[in-house]
Each structure stands twice: as C-alpha cells, then as structure tokens.
C-alpha cells in the first residue's frame, strides 16, 4: 500500500515508472478516511477492531491502518468509494464528526510534524527535518548516500520548529 498526498501523486508515479516498479493505481476507486483526534481510537474501537500502531489489517473489503501521524492517535480507513457514504454514516452514528483537511493540518502543525511537499521536499531530508527515526535500516534505499553523509558529518541545515506562547 502506498498512500501519498494528492499534490505528490504524479511525482510518486513518475518515480515508480522510472524504476520499473509495477503497481495498481486505485486512486479513482478507493477512498481514504482518517479518523483522528482526542477520542478517535476509543470511539471507533466500539465497532471495528483496531490494529496495533504502525500496522494494517483487513476486514472484508476495508483496510484499517495506524500508520499516519498528525499529532493525535487515529486510524486510516481505506475502502471502495461505493462504500464510503455508508461508512461515514456509521462513523457519525457512533459520535464521530466529519471535518476537512484543514483540521488534519492544524493537528500536525500543533505537533510540529512536517508534511512532504511542504516542510519536507527533495531539498529537505528527514535528517535535516529532525526525523531521523523514520529512516530505514536497510542496506540500500533512495538517498542513502546523502543521509549517511549528513548523519556522519552533522554538517547540514536543520529545520527548526517554534512554539508560540500566545
């Protein structure tokens, strides 16, 4: 499963195509609903079985994941778009209110979590953004040489976050 922000979709597809990686693009038939917030896990756990953090599980034709990060705990729900409204109605009938992407951005900004395409780009690495914990331990990956050099030399820019006391 590969989920990217809509603004990065073409870039990701180009990368996959250039590297001859086979994939099935389900963008037009699949929806993603992120259920996040203070009581999200407690509320959604009343009618679905929640996976462990950083894992996924499939029930019928719905995939549940706890792989996102926004500053609040939650679960991402991937389902066929013909089933989306029924699922949204189920959420609402269980006390979970809908909100937009602006809410997600507010949560992640309050938690100082960068978003690829905005605070993270081709020019800003995870090391520079203070996200070294997200880097794989595999022997080889795209950008490994740059990452290794930044970790070793410590001579790189640092993305800094500020908390305003207002």
Task: Please describe what each predicted stretch is.
Residues 1-166:
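Conserved, structured C-terminal
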